[in-house]
């Protein structure tokens, strides 16, 4: 069940946008601030049933052009919630965004502290979910060393490989090379394409940042499937 869905569903259908918050006080704050497409999960993870409902509401004839925006607290719990949302949402990622409140505040507290405009600004500050997930994972690695850059690529190449839009996949492969500091973007793109060709059960999606760091540091999981070797990272 999504709290606020009855009030928001007409606006969701008209605006082709859904803003997902975590608590019922947050959804009330959003609506009071004029963000009338907000719904809340109220303590449960945003799952497949929620996704199916939202996608039905945002359909416009046979042409999908909806935008799903997750808002999370700026703490570790919010970061993990965003990672779980990505797992639910991998096939829908091109239309998904993440907005993180400053100073670890939830939307209700943010409105009380800074007013209605702060919530509208929060929604406007959204970033693509792929960008958020990749940058979250990269935080767990030291990119100042060749070893850290290789481990970071091993963990994040499978994320980029889940992007079904090939043009977007190529763009994120090149961005990933820049974020990691890898000197040859074509090497990263080559490994993304190789990962994308693997059977689905061989691919690894990020579980949460803590586990991601553990598997990357051990050099396990994708490991040798990521081709750039440390000789290319000076």
Language-model regions, residue ranges each:
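Short amphipathic alpha-helical segments
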Residues: 31-33, 82-83
